[in-house]
A protein has these predicted regions:
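N-terminal secretory signal peptides and thylakoid transit peptides that target proteins
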Residues: 1-17
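Immediate post-signal peptide segment of exported/extracytoplasmic ligand-binding proteins
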Residues: 23-36, 70-73, 165-170
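Extracytoplasmic "Venus flytrap"
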Residues: 28-29, 37-57, 79-86, 108-109, ...
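Extracellular/periplasmic periplasmic-binding protein-like sensory domains
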Residues: 246-322, 396-400
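Segments of small-molecule ligand-sensing domains
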Residues: 308-321, 331-390
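Beta-alpha junction/loop-to-helix N-cap segments that form part of ligand/metal-binding clefts
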Residues: 48-54, 66-139, 149, 207-216, ...
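Venus flytrap/periplasmic-binding-protein-like
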Residues: 81, 128, 135-138, 210-211, ...
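Extracellular/periplasmic Venus flytrap/periplasmic-binding protein
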Residues: 86-90, 135-138, 143-250, 292-297
Length: 402
């Protein structure tokens, strides 16, 4: 009797030990749930991007309604960081240490993601598909647990420089940039292509802080430089202000705008559609306002999703299209995990995406990653605002980055 009790206790201990060991290997994952964390700017100067978080909440609700992943429901915990790095650190630590998420997904912005990058890599928590085009997310040697998604700002700067050289070879360039890695990556990209012409062609570069109320004074300074080309590397609030201000000043440079601020709802409409005519931006996702995609199967899929899961949302807002793209990539990555949702395998699958086509990406643009290639999207196409919508022109261009 005593021997049986001892054996039973040993067996129970073995089961408990195995369960604890499995739980330790797959934090945030149980037999019924996969817990994912996100910090998002639902308030503050970049609150227009809050639509991305809302879009992902809806996307994962659909995933759950359709049965989840490998028999598990997604528990997506998205919290506000106000676009404040200290708040992002606080919220990220809470999600990792208290909520015990399996991985962090699509955190917003260069400053906030920079603030948590070392912490997440030290903890070996995947920091996946960062919502920022900073080049620093593609550094697998130093930060293997961090990977971006969209084309890097530096690559986009290179694309814009190529366009300027081809169309305004004698142009005088003025630049407005956010005073952080986001803005400085554009300067680096322009310099990559312009080379020794940079100092001659760039007649003025002026920065702004995310805490500035307006950029009106910067616009006046840039106009006074005599430039006939303007590159604006700014988030939506400041991009809209710039479009409006240069129109009011009567300044008409060739204006190139970062692709993070191409939303009709959060940039063009506040600025005034008529004020943005001729504006050029790069794109990798399909534009919801472009009639060319009215009958596109991918956009039909997106519209059906929006109608069912976000019926009251503004469907002219490109942030919802971006959110759907992020959701689709994450879904594919989770499917590739099979039944192994350890953090190591989650990272492995995120860095082994092959020729992935998404319903919301422009034709010809695909996603590829590898353990040495942390630039998932490296292609873009230019588009011009015609007063009512964005019009694509030219060929798909692949930038630098491997």
């Amino acid at each position: 009797m005593h021997r049986r009790t001892l054996l039973a206790s040993a067996a129970s201990l073995a089961v408990v030990t195995h369960v604890r060991s499995a739980a330790a290997e797959t934090p945030g994952v149980t037999a019924t749930e996969i817990k994912i964390g996100q910090t998002e700017a639902y308030s503050g100067p970049a609150s227009a991007y809050g639509a991305i978080g809302f879009g992902l909440v809806a996307f994962f609700k659909r995933v759950n309604d359709q049965g989840g992943i490998a028999g598990r429901k997604i528990n997506f915990i998205s919290v506000d960081d106000g676009y404040s790095p200290p708040k992002a650190v606080e919220q990220t630590r809470r999600l990792v240490e208290q909520e015990g998420v399996a991985f962090m997904l699509n955190g917003l912005g260069t400053p906030s993601n920079t603030a948590v990058q070392k912490y997440l890599n030290q903890k070996k928590v995947p920091q996946l598909f960062v919502s920022s085009g900073a080049d620093k997310w593609a550094n697998p040697k130093e930060f293997p647990w961090t990977i971006g998604l969209q084309p890097s700002y530096r690559t986009e700067g290179q694309i814009y420089a190529k366009y300027i050289l081809a169309n305004k070879p004698d142009g005088k360039i003025a630049i407005l940039y956010q005073n952080d890695d986001f803005g400085k990556d554009y300067l680096a990209g322009l310099r990559d292509v312009l080379g020794d012409k940079y100092d001659r062609m760039v007649v003025k570069a002026v920065s702004y802080e995310v805490t500035d109320p307006t950029i009106d004074s910067q616009a006046v300074t840039l106009q006074g430089s005599g430039a006939d080309v303007l590159v604006t590397a700014a988030t939506p609030k400041f991009a809209a202000q710039m479009i409006r201000k240069i129109y009011d000043l009567g300044w008409k440079p060739l204006h190139l705008l970062t692709d993070v601020s191409i939303s009709v709802a959060s940039v063009i409409t506040p600025a005034g559609p008529e004020r943005a005519v001729g504006l050029i931006a790069a794109a990798y996702g399909k534009d919801v306002s472009d009639p060319a995609f009215k009958d596109d199967p991918g956009m039909k899929e997106w519209r059906a999703f929006m109608k069912e899961y976000m019926p009251d949302a503004d469907t002219t807002d490109a942030n919802y299209v971006y959110a759907y793209s992020v959701g689709c990539v994450t879904l594919q990555m989770l499917k590739q995990c099979g039944d192994d949702f350890s953090r190591a395998n989650i990272l492995k699958q995120a860095t082994n995406l092959q020729n992935l086509q998404l319903p919301t990406l422009l034709p010809g643009i695909v996603i590829n990653t590898s353990p040495t290639n942390y630039h998932p999207i490296r292609q873009e196409q230019l588009q011009r605002w015609n007063g009512t919508r964005w019009e694509l022109f030219g060929d798909v261009i692949e930038g630098a980055g491997s």
